[in-house]
Structure formats: structure tokens, C-alpha cells
Amino acid sequence: MKKIVRSSCLVTLLAAWLLPLNIFAAEGPESLLHGEMEAINHNFRLVNRQYTDPAQKASTLRLIAEMQTHAEKARTLTPPRAGKLAGDDQTKYVNTFHKDLAALIKEMGALQQAVAADKVDVAKAEIDKIAHLKDASHKELGVGDDHKHKGGPPPPGQ
């Protein structure tokens, strides 16, 4: 009986010790890029909520700087979908990804300047441009629809 208890305790301890290794092994290029993009999106939502509040100016500027850092890191990564393409299609896809990220980083810089200068209307315009860039890029690259609600009734006429 003691041998069975010891064996089951040993198996439990080994499983608990090895489980985190599974989690780290799943951290591949897709999840790295996804993590950077999620961080940009999270900070962008916070900026959108607080950019008009002068009391949160420093926080807003910090969030924008973090967005820029994440975007710069994302620019060094290859989108996972590019690995499924070959030749000219792959080159075109990666070039589009880099072009869209460069445009995003440029608009983040303009947003940072607008917030720093307390130009709320200009900041709002930059936020709108960034949101449009995100939507257009995601549509062009075929990404970003994973988190949308897919349930409910079909559109009329189907």
C-alpha cells in the first residue's frame, strides 16, 4: 500500500513539474507575434479611453511608447501565415506586413506628438487613423477575425 501511495505521489509531482514545460514549448513564433499584437491592441484601447483626460497625460504617453516598442518588436517577427506561402506570394505577404507596421508606427508617433502637445482633436484623428489601419491591414492579410463572435443567426437571405 505504501508503495502505491509513493508511486502515485511521485507521478503527481513529476506531472506538476513537467506541466509548465508544456506551456513554454507552445511559445512559438505565432504566439510571440500574437502576444506583441495583443499588447498593442490592449494599450490602444486604454489610450482611446484616457487620451482626453489631462490628469492621465503621462500614463497615455507611456502607453503609446509601449505600443511603439511592441510594434518595433513585431516588425522583427515573421507572420505565421507567411510560412504557409511560397515564392512571390510569401514575399508580397511579408512586405505588406512590414509596410502596414511601418505605417502604424508612423501614426503612433503622430499620436504621441498630439497627446504631448495637448491637441485632443488631432489625437482623436490619429486614433481613428490607427483603428482604420488595423482594420484594413487585418482584412488585407486575412487575420484578426479569430476573436469575433461567430454565433447567432446567419445574415438575412441565407
Language model: regions and residue ranges:
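C-terminal amphipathic alpha-helix
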Residues: A110-Q158
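Short, solvent-exposed, charged loop/turn and helix-capping segments
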Residues: A74-T96, D145
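N-terminal signal peptide c-region/cleavage motif recognized by signal peptidases
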Residues: L18-N22
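Bacterial N-terminal signal peptides that target proteins for export
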Residues: M1-T12
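Charged, amphipathic alpha-helical oligomerization/scaffolding segments
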Residues: G35, A39-H42, L46, R62, ...
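Amphipathic, charged alpha-helical scaffolds that flank and support histidine-based chemistry
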Residues: R45-L61, L104-I127
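Immediate post-signal-peptide N-terminus of mature secreted/exported proteins
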Residues: F24-A65, P156-G157
